[in-house]
Amino acid sequence: MQPVHTSVLLEECLEFLKPDASDNLFVDGTLGEGGHTEAFLKRYPQLNAIGVDADVSIQERAKERLKPFGERIRFHLGWSDEFFKNYPKDFAPPNLILLDLGISMFHYVKSGRGFSFSSDEPLDMRLNPELRLSAADIVNSYNEKDLADLIFNYGEERYSRKIASRIVEQRAAAAFSNAKELADCIYKAVPQNYRHGKIHPATKTFQALRIAVNGELDRLPRLLEAAFSVLAPNGRLGLITFHSLEDRIVKFYFKELGKSCTCPENMPICKCGGRPRAEVLTKKAVKASDEEIRLNPPSRSARLRVVRKIDYRES
């Protein structure tokens, strides 16, 4: 199997999440095609891993890729926030957790679910087919204000009102059914000088729809807390984000973990014990090198943040 996706910040992840013992367990909570996991299992021969993904089709590709590692890798099909929340009691606590929040290139190129605005694929965007709403459901049913708010809040699209207005106008004649149809509508909705920028004018709207369909920003705070709670003492948690909405949430959560007191400001006496839960290992987000960006342009948006869970067992 030839992988479609190129994993970002690979060397940086391997260094920041280096095992500190031979029996360490690595959990890739966003397995995708398995690029990060393959690199960890190759670099660290004593490491065992669990790969989690909500998309059965891409997990099958990962299973094929990681077959040479045999029993060193186990797989779980489902959302990673739910996996960590219901972490099996008979599993050892993970020492290393990596969460790459980006969408795999597989979904744009091979999934057939309308993630790419240049395709005639059905406008779906669900990572898991059991989800209730597809992108087409949202585009064809939301009123103009709600649609504009969604595009602005999840896509940070400055022309969200114009785009929503054009969508509502066009769907009155015929419902949207494929991705290219929607992309062409967005292209016509925005000012001419916006049509030929660094990114396609539909990029941010498609991002917003994908986030809404899969509940990505709603899941993220739950995912962070659930993953950190099962992490072994001295374990490391790494997050790769690709847009500012995600990165702000991760940055704030890690900052809270590093605080020596988490009591409300109006509380006169500290009740939390006055000890930080984690050490932030990346004072600033780690970015891709110029060389990586040259070889893999999508990596230009990637940001890696890592924390270490402080071990108070012997203090």
Curated annotation (Swiss-Prot):
Q: Name one Pfam family in it.
A: Methyltransf_5
Indicate the transmembrane segments per the record.
none
Write down the chemical reaction(s) this protein catalyses: cytidine(1402) in 16S rRNA + S-adenosyl-L-methionine = N(4)-methylcytidine(1402) in 16S rRNA + S-adenosyl-L-homocysteine + H(+)
Q: Which gene encodes it?
A: rsmH
Gene3D superfamilies in the record: Putative methyltransferase TM0872, insert domain, Vaccinia Virus protein VP39
Stored HAMAP family: 16SrRNA_methyltr_H
Q: What keywords appear on the UniProt entry?
A: Cytoplasm, Methyltransferase, rRNA processing, S-adenosyl-L-methionine, Transferase
- Physiological role: Specifically methylates the N4 position of cytidine in position 1402 (C1402) of 16S rRNA.
Look up the record and give one Gene Ontology term from the biological process aspect. Answer: rRNA base methylation
GO cellular component entries: cytoplasm
Q: Which species is this record about? A: Treponema denticola (strain ATCC 35405 / DSM 14222 / CIP 103919 / JCM 8153 / KCTC 15104)
Stated EC number for the protein is 2.1.1.199
InterPro entries linked: RsmH, SAM-dep_MeTrfase_MraW_recog, SAM-dependent_MTases_sf
Q: What is the name of the protein in this document?
A: Ribosomal RNA small subunit methyltransferase H
Q: Which GO terms describe its molecular function?
A: rRNA (cytosine-N4-)-methyltransferase activity
| Similarity field | Belongs to the methyltransferase superfamily. RsmH family.
